[in-house]
Amino acid sequence: KGVFLLKEVTTSEKRIPALCELYTWLYEQGEHQIDYMIANRNGEYISSLDNGDRYMLKKWYAGRECDIKKTREILEAAGNLAKLHTVMRHELEYGITEGIKTGEKYRRHNRELKKVRQFVRKAVPKGEFEFAFLQQFELMYQWAEAAVCELEQSDYEQLYQEEMNRSGMTHGEYNYHNIIMTREGIATMNFEKFHRDIQVEDLYYFLRKVME
């Protein structure tokens, strides 16, 4: 009985045992306002159709998404995240992936920027946007390279290792879509992208989505 969500599976089946273990751990620590997967008649969490589509059934909550135009709800969501993070420092029996380090992300983005510049240079004919892009690219790229240098000179690597030693985990997709305001308080949904990482990454991602 209650509210449930039938959802198409986009995550790897290999992650399901770790995801189940995470949900169990959170629930045991008193985090009852979370979604979790419901097993089918065969005791499996994923049900496949003849055409190959895969679905899972999840416990859901009646409510609405966090309203990012209301300061009070943003603060409540941030407090909810902090509470989650205190219990999301735990070594799971099933191994989980580590997040891509920020430096690697920055360098990858910079390589992609160069590829975009190369593509725009070869574009024929060029319009107003293409000329403006090429004119401003060098300044933008200098800022991108400066960000990499700043990160390399910071204590990021030490902070990352400390978080790994504490078995820190992040939600991985903590945005207003996954924060449901209910009569009983905030319900946190969709932990499918959880991974090992510096936990403040969740807060950064949440605030970035708020400011967008």
Regions found by a protein language model. Name each.
Residues 50, 108, 195-198:
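A generic short alpha-helical patch detector that favors 3-5-residue windows
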Residues 101-104, 192, 210-211:
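A ubiquitous short alpha-helical element
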Residues 23, 85, 89, 125, ...:
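Gram-positive cell-envelope targeting signals
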Residues 7-13, 94-169:
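ATP-dependent phospho-/nucleotidyl transfer catalytic cores
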Residues 37, 149-200:
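Active-site acidic catalytic loop and adjacent metal/ATP-binding pocket
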Residues 199-212:
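Active-site activation/catalytic loop segments of kinase-like enzymes and analogous catalytic loops
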Residues 85-89, 148, 152, 211:
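Hydrophobic/aromatic-lined pockets within catalytic cores
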Residues 3-95:
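ATP-binding pocket architecture of kinase catalytic cores
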